[in-house]
Amino acid sequence: MNMKKATIAATAGIAVTAFAAPTIASASTVVVEAGDTLWGIAQSKGTTVDALKKANNLTSDKIVPGQKLQVTEVASEKTEKSVSATWLNVRSGAGVDNSIVTSLKGGTKVTVEAAESNGWNKISYGEGKTGYVNGKYLGDAVTSAPVAKQEVKQETTKQTAPAAETKTEVKQSTPAPTAPKAAETKTAPVVDTNATTHTVKSGDTIWALSVKYGASVQDLMSWNNLSSSSIYVGQKIAVKQSAAKTAAPKAEVKTEAPAVEKETSTPVVKENTNTTVKKEVTTQTQTNTTKAPAQAAKPAPAPAPAPTVNTNASTYTVKSGDSLSKIANTFGTSVSKIKALNNLTSDNLQVGTVLKVKGTVPTTNTNNNSNTTAPTTNTSNNNTSSNTSTPSKNTNTNTNQGSSNSASASALIAEAQKHLGKAYSWGGNGPTTFDCSGFTSYVFAKSGISLPRTSGAQYASTSRISESQAKPGDLVFFDYGSGIAHVGIYVGNGQMINAQDNGVKYDNIHGSGWGKYLVGFGRV
């Protein structure tokens, strides 16, 4: 009678357990063969490694050929969850050692097919595709599925050991604490993928932003006029093409000086973050590039008065916001010529100053001195010696000038070579780190020559020369598609020294991808 009661009790326990589970399990036996693993058997039988170990009282993953394993196939209750991370990698197996199949965007709905003991879940997504993800990155978790699996497997062992009913009750409550883990993941921030701009935070990279917003690295660099992948904390990055269009300053400058393309192609690409630059041209460009997208369209009517400038005039009165490069572009001349016409020793201007913008630059004092000394020699000698000595002096003067220019270029290149191997930093002015135009400005300054701070402004302030005319010490410019964005110091034989992502180094201007971006050469 006692045995009958025990049997009834066991049966009742099984019935209660089966009722609590979402589905009914069926048991089978598998014989381990050479090369088999618990994970492989679990996959082929629609169960989990944890379930196999519990059903067979295994304390490790080790199995041997010929070993018989009790397998319980469980049709789990499928649970719908959503990806709580920004992007979640789907792998071919339950662990980071397995290959990535794809990545799911935050908020994507998935169905959990099974839960592994290591916290990974087998999921289905899309149209019947399956894979494995880390369960802590799934929100809205329902824990009934793993409870059902454990209960049903104990029900299988209960047929041979009624006392196992007590174990079932204990295990039924064991998975419950896993629920808060899923709930915690709900607090993970979900990125607004509809945003058009992103403010850079610590740890951000161009690649991470491209993944986060579904844009390619090339697009992000193009939309933001970046010549390298370097970004800095606090920088506002356009992550949609629409933001790039409204933020670009090109149209605003173009209407202001429609006849000159140089100013149009002078966006501050890498250097517009340098707050220490005092050149007015840099300040003006920075102001344009930091406007909010909603305001960028407003300045369009402002340049309307630009056509009132008489570009045929020989003088110009400096106005607020003017710079030498801007004035030079407006009148189709160069910064160096305006400085020579007005005896300027720096690029600084004052509002109200009247500048000569047309005319002939007077010859240098060196030539005049040479000419005046010739008659003096003639006076002190007879005609024969006079004729002989005069060309001798002229020849010496020209030779000295050539040597001086050569020496100046050699000194400039020697200064550039001192910094080979130094690190690149966006906005770097030296002497420990540089960006491209910071490097050229620093090197030329060491030779007593003042250059504008940005590559675009340097392009506008130099005289155009062909590659066949280029000599060591000239500047070489590059355009990635949005205006002048890079500058280096030409050293001859198709080589330049420049500051780029890999630091200060030599580069072939026609090799390693540089050739297709080469714009031309400029002489200071």
Curated annotation (Swiss-Prot):
It comes from the Bacteria. Coiled coil: none annotated. Residues 28-71, 196-239, 314-357 form the LysM domain. The keyword Protease applies. Keywords: Hydrolase, Protease, Repeat, Signal, Thiol protease. Its EC number is 3.4.-.-. Belongs to the peptidase C40 family. NCBIfam families: PRK13914.1. This major extracellular protein may be involved in the invasion of non-professional phagocytic cells by Listeria. This is Probable endopeptidase p60. It comes from Listeria welshimeri. The gene is iap.
